[in-house]
């Protein structure tokens, strides 16, 4: 990437995101044209009278859903790219540390016992952070410097919680509880509102701000530990901080929209093709690409058929072939990340 091309790429991605978001306001059963959307937004900004139906559709249904999709997409993509950086492995994604499965079990447990919305949030977050604590505990117990051990612990916990989720599904009431559990696990923004958006936006803003401020340090994680230490950077604390922040993003995401896969794996690869591997430019680019991608997927989910398609189905259908194409191009170009 040429040094002067990064601002242009960033501006182009930002413009694409804004255009996609505006068009998304008009997509749905109650369709609106771009001029109509502009008139409604202008009327809202200038306190003019707005059609009650249009106001309800735009500001109470679609706008919080769009903003939630943007934040979730940016958060998952950011989590994926920083984890790939600290593990020095392009195949790592947020699921690898077990937080997704732990949070999913917490949410499934809440639905199984009929908890309220706040109970669902609390259970999901507690099990997500509990899983993260177990990863830290076992990693320190065995070998805190071994990245392989950390991955193995995450995989073990992920498998355990996935089995527990399956057990709860097996014993759930097939008339009421099971459909709710299955739909929630597949991921959706159908129930998005301002309350859920605020619940996710606060930790998203905090975690993403810290990770962006650490972007130059993330470049040092590609160095040997002795070389990084010579430069005055302590690898272990930085690595644990990044894992904690990434896990926090994932746990909060699962709480509001269920389990969504492939985003944290695919988007970092697409972003590297645009701006390279320097985390100072890669992180903002990845967040913009992730936000736009998630918004496009959600548009397809709510407009392709009368019944809304779960997000995780679409991300897998798009992500798996796309990842195959990326791997083929990397191999053909002789690249080896």
From Swiss-Prot:
**Which residue stretches are annotated as topological domain Periplasmic?**
26-51, 114-116, 172-193, 258-264, 305-310
UniProt keyword DNA damage present? no
Q: Which InterPro entries match?
A: ABC_BtuC-like (IPR037294), ABC_transptr_permease_BtuC (IPR000522)
**Subcellular localization:** Cell inner membrane
Q: Relate the induction remark in this record.
A: Expression is repressed by molybdate.
Q: Which GO terms describe its biological process?
A: siderophore-dependent iron import into cell
| Membrane-crossing segments per the record | 6-25, 52-87, 99-113, 117-140, 147-171, 194-214, 235-257, 265-275, 279-304, 311-329
Write down the Pfam families for this protein, in alphabetical order: FecCD
UniProt note: domains: The transition from the outward-facing to the inward-facing conformation is realized through the asymmetric motion of individual subunits of the transporter. Nucleotide binding is coupled to a conformational shift at the periplasmic gate. This shift is akin to unlocking a swinging door: allowing just enough space for molybdate to slip into the cell. The lower cytoplasmic gate, identified as gate I, remains open throughout the MolBC-A mechanism, and cytoplasmic gate II closes in the presence of nucleotide.
**Member of which family?**
Belongs to the binding-protein-dependent transport system permease family. FecCD subfamily.
- Whom does it interact with, and what assembly results? The complex is composed of two ATP-binding proteins (MolC), two transmembrane proteins (MolB) and a solute-binding protein (MolA).
Could you tell me what this protein is called? Answer: Molybdate import system permease protein MolB
The organism of origin for this protein? Haemophilus influenzae (strain ATCC 51907 / DSM 11121 / KW20 / Rd)
Provide the gene name from the record. Answer: molB
